Each structure stands twice: as C-alpha cells, then as structure tokens.
C-alpha cells in the first residue's frame, strides 16, 4: 500500500510539472501593421523626456520608434497565447503557451516573419519581502570623502571632476541588472534620488528582492556616506530596472534586456549602466560562438545599438571570461557604438578575468577599462565588501560618464563617448585587452571645455 501511494504521489508530481511547463517564443514581425501614429506627432507614443533627449541631440524620431499595431497583438492573443514582452525597435513580440506546437500556428499569420524558442519553464511564485527597518552600515569612517571607494574613483581622476561641482545632478541613469535587494533599506542609499523602478521579468513585483548583484552595482554609482563610501554619481537621478531572471540562463533574457533599454528610453534616461552579459545558455543549442560577436547577430546587441542611436550613452561590462575557455567579451559587449568596460587592478594592469577582444569583425573591444579588482561595494544587509568583476568597473565609469556629460551638456552621447576614449591611458596604442586604456575623466572634461569654446567662437 505504501509503494502504491508513493507511486501516486510521484505521478501527481510529474503531472503537475507537465501541466505547469510553459514555452515562450520570440515572434519576428514583417512590419508594425497599420499605424494610427506617425513620426510627425511623437507625443502620441513617446514620453516628453524621450523626445527632449532626441531633440537636444538632433536625432529624428523614426519608424523604429513607432509602436507595434494593437491589431497584430490581438491576433497573436487570439491564438491562445499570452503576450509577455515586446520590442518596438526590433519589431518582435514574445508570447507564452503551454504547448510547443504553437509555433506552426503562429507562422501561418500573414504578418509573422519567423518564430524562435526563447524559454521553457514553469511559473514560480514570488514571496514579497516585508522588512521595513533601516540597515545601517557598521564601518569606521575614513578621513576622506570617498571612504573605502577612494582608489576606484581617483584612478580615473573622478575626484577632480567632482571638485568642479559635477556629481551627476540633473543626469538620469538607468541601471539594468538582476535585482537590488535591500537598496530601499540601506542607509547609504537614503539620499539617492531613485525616480522609479521596473521589473521586466516579473511585472508588478518589487526589484528590491531576489538578487544582490544590482545592489553592489548601484553602490558604485549612488552610495552616499562620506568617509565610508561615496559613489561616482551620488547626485544623479536613478531608474532601477530588473531584466535578469536569476532562475536560469535562457535567450529570453535578451528580450527582457531589450524591453529594459526601451523603457529606459521612455523615461528619458541619458545613461544606461548594464553589468549583464551572455554567451552560453541552459540549452547549448542556443549558445553563441566567437563568430557571432559582430555586434549585429545577437538580439541583445541589436537592442544596445538602437539605444545608442537614440542618443543614450550605454556602458556595458566586457565580461569575466578572460581566464576561461571562452576568453572573449560577451554580448552585448560587441556592440559598436557603446562603451564596453574591462577591468584593471589597482596598478592598472588587466585583471586576469577581464574578457578580451577583438570582435569577430576585427573591432577593438573592450573600449576602456576601470578598476575591477578589489572594488569597494555595498552588499545586502549593509555590509561593505571588496568584490571583483567588470560588473563593478562598468558602473564606476558610468557614473563619471554622467558627471562628464553634466559638465559638457552641449555635447551629444557620441561625443562624450569619444572624449572618454580619446584621453584614456593608451589611446595612442589601443589593444584588445584594455582598449584605449583607463580613462582620465578630468582631461576629458578640460578637452571638452576647450573644444566648446572653439565652437562658440
């Protein structure tokens, strides 16, 4: 009798797994369908902030900005599937269905170009945290403004930029990551101007739980406890966006990331700092190869390039594969018009884990490098720690990039990117380990001022 009951329980468990398994597919559209919107009236589909950033940089609203036809989405829903996310820039919609046979049904729709699998799994219920008490950092203050983060900021002369009064005020930064556990409770973020949050993976759920990575990343940018830790842009305005699903690695995370950068565009972000990168997934058939690192193959890289073309200054991590068999940068680090950031030690030598280039089409990557070994970060719980990774060199530089743009508002994103590379430590002899080298943000600032005065004359 015991064995029979055990069999029934196992059968029920397997049946439950089967019933709860879902498939998600990326649907590529041939076009966006009949439009009630047009590029002459962007206020109908773009936010005021997104339009303003384009106007400031003389970037025209284009077809890629137009929304996907609601009729198309209704027809997809009529196939019995749920709509998960979409990309207006890349004309795709991700749908979910409890049966993989949906693919053939979708392909029969006249407006569908192609369909590919991006995820398989089950819905996992999330438990919302109910902690409200403030977490205080118990660490002895040092006799300097930056505390334990001093080295990582001074390496790029960020302290000199700050002394000129440029600490990120008026700059909107979107941080795209896996989660920001305890950021809403740690006292080092009490004065941080967080304008809003967005959970792309689990819409409507908090970003302040489930993963600590984004907490550490944000601390490099936004922490503000003088003498203990001050980030590189403590006076900037922040949007915290979760695009990484910590439960596994599937191609759909590229769709989430694309949705995240489009959302960052919609709220008027000037800077994106992303410390996420991909090359292999739980399903090996979907892995990328070195030959795919063209900046055009990976879906996520296409989205990153579009963000750059919309006037957003995108910083992304090179990856931590330098001492693995892969060795190379990850995607979207292969994207042409963004700043890919490698990592160096305190002595400005390449960190052995920092991913290298070149891209498959021969371009230099990473673009630049910042301190990524023994970085000062804040962990959930309010603990100061040292951490390694291009995940941290990226926000350290991104924050100073925001300060530089604050100082030189007459320049566009491409010009700020060029200034950062032009005055880095090995700009005259760039390579595929550190790119143009470690930036000197004060030199970039002075050069930008000089160039600006020439323009005015």
List each language-model region with its residue ranges.
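N-terminal domain-start motif of subtilase-like serine proteases
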Residues: 83-87, 102-103, 127-175, 198-210, ...
């Amino acid at each position: 009798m015991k064995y029979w009951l055990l069999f029934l329980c196992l059968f029920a468990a397997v049946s439950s797994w089967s019933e709860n398994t879902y498939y998600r597919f990326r649907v590529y559209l041939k076009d966006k369908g009949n439009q009630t919107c047009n590029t002459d009236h962007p206020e109908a589909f773009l936010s005021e902030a997104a339009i303003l950033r384009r106007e400031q940089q003389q970037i025209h609203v284009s077809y890629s900005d137009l929304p996907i036809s609601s009729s198309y989405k209704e027809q997809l829903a009529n196939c019995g599937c749920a709509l998960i996310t979409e990309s207006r820039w890349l004309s795709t919609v991700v749908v979910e269905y409890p049966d993989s046979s949906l693919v053939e049904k979708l392909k029969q729709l006249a407006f569908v170009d192609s369909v590919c699998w991006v995820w398989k799994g089950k819905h996992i219920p999330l438990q919302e945290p109910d902690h409200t008490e403030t977490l205080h950092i118990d660490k002895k203050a040092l006799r300097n403004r930056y505390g334990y983060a001093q080295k990582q900021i001074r390496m790029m002369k960020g302290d000199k930029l700050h002394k000129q009064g440029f600490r990120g005020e008026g700059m909107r930064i979107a941080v795209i990551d896996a989660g920001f556990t305890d950021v809403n409770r740690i006292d080092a973020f009490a004065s941080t101007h967080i304008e809003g949050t967005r959970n792309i993976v689990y819409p409507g759920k908090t970003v302040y739980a489930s993963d600590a990575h984004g907490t550490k990343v944000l601390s490099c940018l936004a922490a503000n406890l003088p003498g203990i830790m001050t980030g590189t842009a403590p006076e900037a305005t922040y949007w915290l966006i979760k695009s990484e699903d910590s439960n596994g690695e599937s191609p759909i995370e590229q769709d989430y990331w694309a949705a995240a950068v489009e959302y960052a565009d919609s709220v008027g972000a000037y800077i994106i700092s992303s410390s996420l990168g991909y090359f292999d997934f739980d399903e090996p058939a979907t892995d990328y190869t070195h030959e795919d690192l063209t900046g055009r193959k990976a879906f996520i890289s296409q989205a990153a390039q579009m963000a750059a073309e919309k006037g957003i200054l995108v910083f992304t991590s090179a990856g931590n594969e330098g001492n693995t068999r892969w060795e190379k940068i990850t995607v979207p680090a292969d994207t042409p018009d963004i700043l890919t950031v490698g990592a160096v030690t305190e002595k400005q030598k390449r960190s052995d884990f920092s991913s290298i280039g070149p891209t498959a089409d021969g371009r230099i990557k990473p673009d630049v490098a910042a301190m990524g070994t023994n970085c000062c970060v804040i962990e959930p719980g309010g603990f100061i720690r040292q951490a390694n990774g291009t995940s941290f060199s990226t926000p350290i530089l991104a924050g100073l990039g925001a300060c530089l743009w604050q100082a030189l508002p007459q320049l566009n994103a491409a010009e700020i990117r060029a200034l950062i590379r032009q005055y880095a430590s090995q700009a005259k002899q760039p390579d595929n380990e550190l790119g143009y080298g470690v930036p000197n943000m004060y030199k970039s600032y002075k050069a930008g001022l000089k160039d600006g005065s020439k323009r005015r004359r």
